Amino acid sequence: TLEDLEEGIRFVHQNDKKIYLTLNLFMHNRDVAKLPQFVETLRHLQPDGVLIADPGVFMYVKEHAPELNLFVSTQANICSSLAVKFWQQQGAKLCVLGREVTFEEMQEIRRQCPDILLECFMHGAMCMSYSGRCLISNYLADRSANQGKCAHCCRWHYKLHLRLKDGSVKEIEINDQNKDAFEFLLEEEFRPGELYEVVEDEHG
């Protein structure tokens, strides 16, 4: 609740620490009407920074709450010094680099962008296959899906290694003969063609 956030921010500041709030959703038109209320809440709470990924949201918050420190979320997929410089020119105080950026690239970006705070994830999910930015192809085949060279790893056949209760590992190959023994559905073979169907309800 708003009261919980107020209490949390007050506690953090009383202990000389900083607190950041996220507004890093990618907005659909149906969400835009809610943005003024979100921004008013942020202005009321006065966090030490706000993490944003959507350029439109960044522009709106910058215009309507210029006193807030704006940070760019990892979901903005910042992978180069050019992208960092762009966001810096827009008024960003900190950029969280994309999860696929190597340590060597981070060092180079730091040298080329010395006057802005940079942050990176050290551990956690890799958020693969969202909006076409598939990292599986990069990782398994050294082919960038974002540059028209996708290896379509999502369509490969895989083997599962299951760890049993006794600690032993059993290899299982999923094929037409044993697929009905599993509780999950191998959807891909039941869909003709190369493209996924678009299925959408009132929730998106």
Give the location of each predicted region.
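As written
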Residues: 91-92
